[in-house]
Amino acid sequence: MSKAVGIDLGTTYSCVAHFVNDRVEIIANDQGNRTTPSFVAFTDTERLIGDAAKNQAAMNPANTVFDAKRLIGRKFDDPEVQNDIKHFPFKVVEKGGKPHIQVEFKGETKVFTPEEISSMVLTKMKETAESYMGGKVTDAVITVPAYFNDSQRQATKDAGLIAGLNVLRIINEPTAAAIAYGLDKKEQGKGEQNILIFDLGGGTFDVSLLSIDEGIFEVKATAGDTHLGGEDFDNRLVNHFANEFKRKYKKDLTTNQRALRRLRTACERAKRTLSSSAQTSVEIDSLYEGIDFYTSITRARFEELCQDLFRSTLDPVEKVMRDGKLDKSQVAEIVLVGGSTRIPKIQKLVSDFFNGKEPNKSINPDEAVAYGAAVQAAILTGDTSSKTQDLLLLDVAPLSLGIETAGGVMTKLIPRNTTIPTKKSEIFSTYSDNQPGVLIQVYEGERAKTKDNNLLGKFELSGIPPAPRGVPQIEVTFDIDANGILNVSAVEKGTGKSQKITITNDKGRLSKEEIDRMVAEAEKYKEEDEKEAARIAAKNGLESYAYSLKQTASEKQFEEKVDASKRESLNKAIEETISWLDNNQSATTDEYEDKRKELEGIANDALKDLYAAGGVPGGAAPGGFPGAGGAAPGADQGPSVEEVD
């Protein structure tokens, strides 16, 4: 029996499970609860984790930390982090561009990273498993939202390491939930089935489209919002009641963190009640300045307060259907995961979207993710149960990955929704003569220009022997491991010089806002992007043509066979074109094309003589690399790598 566990590290609650005797056991904590609040509290005497931390939150708001998952792997100046900080009763400070949490612990000021806070929650889950299983637990599979980016995944893995865990694998929450749904189904021999996992938790939202066939779970597409969940619905209720309190009593309770915490706890309770009742009352004694706050709210009012948030959950559903190229009628089951899917309005929206099809509620929305992670942990540690035999998980990369080539173009090596693990290599070359090195800049995102995407990291490959532009061959390899974490390497074929980089979160990384903006804007800006791509192709085409003509014109037989005046006018035209290009980096497609026609006219006249005399140019045929990269040589902006078709 393996001692490996599956841990669902949630924004608001976490859960741990273990696969034993052909079944999954969800492990209850010391309070007897099967889920544990992702809360850590610091007092004058001790550190509390889980239920104990959450229970004292109102008395100690400034030193009770929660929602670390909303900060992990993000930059401090990320607008979402800034927005969250407004709601947090604890202090978030900036160190090295990243958010850190500042608390008072045992009488001194301490600063923790989000990874450290998450690692404390993981430690609690590890101890919960150890007390149940007897003995040490080190191997774990930890889940993350499918839409978590590279840096958030890496940071989550780091949190596991800090907690003393050997992180076997980072897997996506919806995929783990799909295992929970499909594990019992694989014996039924239903053939291939498309299922949609709709996972709306406390702080994150994911939608994944999978096909399940005889134990093979293949993710077709994934989308989501790493910053939408039950917490946001609670916030709407808190604001609603705070405003009501202000209207009734002319007092602003939002200045008092303790009152806010008590109100938030009451709101969370009211929200849950509204999933089963049409209305509920909120009663808080001595909420603020001795005032008892008694009020009520109906389900309809709650739905209206969160209307835009509820509706926004359908955008990723539409996106995965588009990306997966499936029709609504081809989805066999819609599986709801995450506590927030208990909200009747959410269920109705999903059902209406799929033309009245009822969502499947056969799995426990709070436990499904940990359940699937436990199954994966058992498989990875060599469990031989008949249940887990032949179970194969094929997940995907949520965002396209590529490098910047000349002209600031995003050259994608791995498109979004590519099955992982995956490895892809492409050959690039230098951009100017005798260039000694290239700068490889790695980006993620969906836009055509790298400036609109997210820079993951960069490295220099130097020591390239002097050679004309386009001659050295630089092979760039992207390798995404099964955790969705990227390694990039580059090797110069001639010398065998190589350089590699694991993209970790040295660079504070992407927010859901940016990711979502990228994909949403990518649709909107697709036309602009295409226009820009055509413009750069025209510019690069003209430049390659001018240089290949220049090479032809410098050859001996050209000088021997072509009339001197024609040679002179061609050389003059080439030099003029090259200098015009240097000064007109942002001309239009038409201007580049006109310039090329002009040059072609002069060139054809001279080349006629050459061909008539039987000389064929030994250099590259005029035309160069079609669609090759291009900031003009000598222009120092941007990288100096050129794509070779």
UniProtKB/Swiss-Prot annotation:
First and last residue of the signal peptide: none
Domain of life where this protein originates: Eukaryota
Compositional bias of kind Gly residues: 615-632
Cellular localisation: Cytoplasm
Protein name: Heat shock protein 70 1
GO cellular component entries: cytoplasm
Organism: Pichia angusta
Residues with PTM N-acetylserine: 2
A molecular function GO annotation: ATP binding
PANTHER family, sorted: HEAT SHOCK PROTEIN 70KDA
Entries under Pfam families matching the protein: HSP70 (PF00012)
Region annotation Disordered: where it falls in the sequence: 612-645
Residues forming coiled coils: none
Keywords associated with the record: Acetylation, ATP-binding, Chaperone, Cytoplasm, Nucleotide-binding, Stress response
Name of encoding gene: HSA1
Induction, per UniProt: By heat shock.
NCBIfam families: PRK00290.1
CDD domains reported for this sequence: ASKHA_NBD_HSP70_HSPA1 (cd10233)
Task performed by this protein: Acts as a chaperone.
InterPro entries documented for this protein: ATPase_NBD, Heat_shock_70_CS, HSP70_C_sf, HSP70_peptide-bd_sf, Hsp_70_fam
